[in-house]
């Protein structure tokens, strides 16, 4: 019970509500600029406020990508109109092509709070290494989408029993596990602050746990759907249950829940990423 400690202007009846500090979502796609037929900064922020979120970090895969100072400033200016904190992450690579580092100094100075090519995995290990060294110098985090396309023939669904039942190959956990292991070790050797995005594999959770034990500055996030659903959801919901990385096995889901409990996973992030109905069909 909160004791009455003085005068007040308003009494809010919060019976049946959860009273908490404003929530923070480190992984949202507001599709602005360039893809605003799906969402924009104003509508995304309104939805965030409705859900109790007062700070969000927007991903960089807009059109154009957030690889330039002008787009960073645009997101900040639009965010200031919303009533919540809208913090832009900028691209690691120019055009999200994975070949050349962005001007991370200038992007940070413009207001970028971190760097990510979310949606596209970075396959150039040398570029990842250089990005981590620069991020360490600037004291900013990097966030990585970990799916090696070399192991994936059909994305959106786990390579497992459900995919086999549907007559497709799917995306194996190996695609995630291999890049998580790589980036955890590069993080260990560079001292960079690295976040593993939307983790979906129990083995990847163990890799993050090991990296932390070795002293790496690594964090991991998980989405609500990856710890509440598994690959069988595709049979019920069809394309609406397809995503990257995919929903995996019940064993993976259990491993993720255990990772939340033991601290291997640090954050629940929504990966709020609206699409049109035509795109999801």
Per-region residue spans from a language model:
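Histidine-rich, glycine-flanked metal-binding segment
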Residues: 1-22
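Divalent metal-coordination and catalytic microenvironments
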Residues: 16, 27, 48, 52, ...
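Acidic (Asp/Glu)-rich catalytic clusters
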Residues: 75-81, 104-109
